[in-house]
Swiss-Prot record:
Function: An accessory protein needed during the final step in the assembly of 30S ribosomal subunit, possibly for assembly of the head region. Essential for efficient processing of 16S rRNA. May be needed both before and after RbfA during the maturation of 16S rRNA. It has affinity for free ribosomal 30S subunits but not for 70S ribosomes.
Family: Belongs to the RimM family.
GO process annotations (BP): ribosomal small subunit biogenesis; rRNA processing
Localization (cell): Cytoplasm
Protein name: Ribosome maturation factor RimM
Domain PRC barrel: 97-171
Quaternary structure, from the entry: Binds ribosomal protein uS19.
Underlying gene: rimM
A Pfam family that the UniProt record links to this protein: RimM
Superkingdom field: Bacteria
Keyword Chaperone: yes
Domain comment in the entry: The PRC barrel domain binds ribosomal protein uS19.
Transmembrane segment boundaries: none
Keywords assigned: Chaperone, Cytoplasm, Ribosome biogenesis, rRNA processing
Amino acid sequence: MSSGNQTFLIGKVSATHGVRGQLRITSFSGDMDSFMALRSVMIKKPGGGMETLAVAEAKAHGKKIILSLKGYTDINDVLHLVGREIYVLRDQLPLLSDGEYYWCDLLGLQVMTEDGDILGELVDIISTGSNDVYVVHGGGDKEILIPALDDVVLDVDTVAGRMTVSLPEGLLDL
C-alpha cells in the first residue's frame, strides 16, 4: 500500500459555502492540516473516473474544511460537485510518525487477540473525539467495538494484514 499512485479518500463535498464557488468538505482524514497543503484534489465523477482540480485555498471552518478551487468562482459552477468524494494521491499526504496510520491502511486488517484468537475483520472506524473506535465484524452478525487505545491495541502489522489487541475484561460479553 505504499505506492505513490494510490488514491486516498480524504473527504466528501457536503455542501456549497457562500455564493463564490466555495465547497464545504467533511474530512475523513481526522487531520485538517492534510487539506491545507494540497495543491490539487481528484473528485470522483458520477459514472466513475476522476476529475483532477487545482486547489486555490483550503481553510478550517469549525469541523469542516472550506475548499476553493481554481477557476470556480460562482455557486452555480460547483453545485454539481455536492455529494462527491474527494481523493488525493498518497504521496500528497504528510508522512506519519511511528504508530500512526491512515484509516485506509487499517480497514481490512484481521484482528486477533494476544492469544491468537481471531476476532474478525476491521471494517469501519468511528471517530468519537477522545479516541477512535474500531468496528470489527466476526462471523455472522457479530460486531465488536474496540477502543483504539495504546493499552488495547498491542500491535499493527499492515504488511501482514493484522492487528493484535488485548481486550478489556468483559468486552466480548456486551
